[in-house]
């Protein structure tokens, strides 16, 4: 039996969109685990893994954001994929050669399919092995439920979970796959990040744990970590410079549409590219 897990945020999206979809497709008796009022997606998923592990009838979990609507049952795809014991995790979209939590920047390696708020992201509907998945929806089997946890205190907030979980699964010797999970609809009507400081904290931690860093790079990583609290001040200074320069009306075609944020995140990604080919798993 495959259950469902959702970290529920403020607002009514879960009750209006996500829960009705789960109820429409889930098998009778299949449990739904919810975590509310959470400060970290990582601790929430650890807790749901613990709850699922305590139920010996559960063979897997479908974990999804609270703004995702299921129109068909992804468990049907997951059951087929998890017949292969070498697989520990399945996503809807993902990629490889990943050096950043922004896995989608590796455009040539993107695989899978999901319908987002404004477009269909279609990189192929077959089954593909990847290094990273998007956590908008992901599936794990019993082995992963029992054996994988995010180390306490290592990661925070809500950014980068899919990439980091995929790395943990691969580091434990299991494969990560993506496949079209049958008409998944992501109703996110906005763009951007839930927390830029958490994003960079998690990215730097992930680099320290899973990439071959030189002593100088490791020192630089720690020093940059100390500057993360100043990110809001950096953004404010850039916004002021744009206003003074008469460019406050500008928009970008990046992840957020905000040129100030997109330039900052783009700079982080360019730093990450020097790590290509140096992942340890």
Swiss-Prot record:
Q: In which pathway does it act?
A: Antibiotic biosynthesis; streptomycin biosynthesis
The protein's job, in short, is:
May be involved in the formation of N-methyl-L-glucosamine.
Gene that codes for this?
A: strF
**Protein name per UniProt:** Streptomycin biosynthesis protein StrF
Domain of life from the UniProt record? Bacteria
What is any one GO biological process for this UniProt entry? streptomycin biosynthetic process
Protein species of origin: Streptomyces griseus
Which keywords does UniProt give here? Antibiotic biosynthesis, Streptomycin biosynthesis
């Amino acid at each position: 039996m495959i259950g469902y897990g959702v970290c529920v945020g403020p607002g009514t999206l879960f009750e209006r969109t996500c829960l009705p979809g789960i109820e429409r497709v889930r098998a009778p008796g299949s449990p739904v685990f919810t975590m509310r009022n959470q400060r970290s997606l990582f601790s929430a998923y650890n807790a749901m893994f613990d709850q699922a592990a305590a139920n010996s009838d559960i063979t897997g979990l479908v974990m999804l954001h609270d703004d995702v609507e299921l129109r068909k049952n992804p468990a049907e795809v997951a059951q087929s994929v998890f017949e292969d014991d070498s697989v520990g995790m399945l996503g809807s979209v993902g990629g490889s050669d990943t050096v950043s939590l922004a896995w989608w920047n590796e455009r040539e390696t993107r695989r899978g399919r999901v319908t987002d708020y404004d477009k269909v992201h279609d990189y192929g509907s077959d089954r593909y092995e990847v290094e990273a998945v998007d956590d908008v929806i992901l599936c794990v089997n019993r082995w992963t439920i029992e054996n994988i946890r995010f180390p306490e205190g290592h990661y925070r907030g809500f950014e980068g979970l899919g990439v980091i979980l995929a790395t943990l699964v691969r580091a434990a010797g299991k494969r990560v796959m993506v496949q079209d999970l049958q008409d998944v609809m992501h109703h996110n009507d906005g763009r951007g990040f839930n927390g830029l400081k958490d994003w960079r904290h998690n990215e730097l931690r992930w680099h320290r744990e899973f990439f071959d860093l030189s002593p100088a790079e490791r020192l630089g990583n720690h020093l940059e970590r100390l500057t993360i609290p100043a990110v809001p001040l950096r953004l404010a200074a850039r916004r002021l410079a744009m206003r003074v320069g008469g460019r406050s009306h500008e928009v970008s075609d990046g992840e957020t549409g905000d040129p100030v944020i997109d330039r900052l995140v783009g700079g982080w990604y360019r730093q990450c590219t020097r790590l290509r080919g140096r992942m340890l798993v």
